[in-house]
A protein has these predicted regions:
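ATP-dependent adenylate-handling active sites, centered on carboxylate activation for C-N bond formation
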Residues: 26-177
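N-terminal segments that mediate ammonia production and transfer
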Residues: 1-39
């Protein structure tokens, strides 16, 4: 069978398989527990920091090398900063810039990279390259979606993927926070 990946889930292939977490089961279990008082903003911030550090550490301490996407925004900058804090060597981060200054955040990304001491790879996508990527989208994505970031994400994935099998990103941070 072929199914969509559950939101918030991950897949690890093992002989015989094992499902270690299910959102529905977790929700039902949580509903059975007595309500706890909400943490303060400071406590919630501290908890989030710990969870993010653990998540990044788990991915960085894999047997394969990883890099990161760096847009210069808050989310990817935070991920890259946490990666660099956990690494003895400069990590590698990739940015896709644009010729249109209204859409280009590569200056911010370069400043973040310099400040953190990461090895920064900056690639400028021109309109020809954008059109080439656009024509390939039906073969790349398993279903259509309308997100302007899919072109630079695809390009960054290909650039990073040529050197690192794992990429960490800040995607989803805006929606979460």
């Amino acid at each position: 069978d072929l199914n969509d990946h559950a939101a918030g889930g991950s897949t690890q292939a093992t002989q015989g398989g094992h499902r270690y977490w299910c959102a529905r089961d977790a929700m039902q279990s949580a509903l059975q527990e007595p309500l706890q008082p909400a943490p303060s903003l400071e406590q919630a911030t501290d908890q989030l920091e710990v969870v993010l550090q653990q998540a990044i550490a788990a991915r960085m301490h894999s047997p394969v090398a990883c890099g990161a996407f760096l847009s210069g925004g808050t989310d990817s900058s935070r991920v890259v900063a946490m990666m660099q804090a956990q690494s003895a060597l400069p990590i590698e981060a990739w940015t896709v810039g644009f010729d249109d200054p209204g859409h280009d955040e590569s200056d911010w990304a370069s400043q973040v990279a310099r400040h953190l001491g990461v090895h920064h790879h900056l690639h400028r996508m021109d309109s020809r390259q954008g059109l080439d990527l656009l024509q390939r989208l039906p073969q790349v994505w398993c279903e259509p979606f309308a997100d302007a970031s899919q072109l630079p994400t695809l390009l960054a994935s290909e650039l990073l993927g040529a050197r690192k099998p794992v990429a960490l990103t800040g995607d989803g941070g805006d929606e979460l926070f």
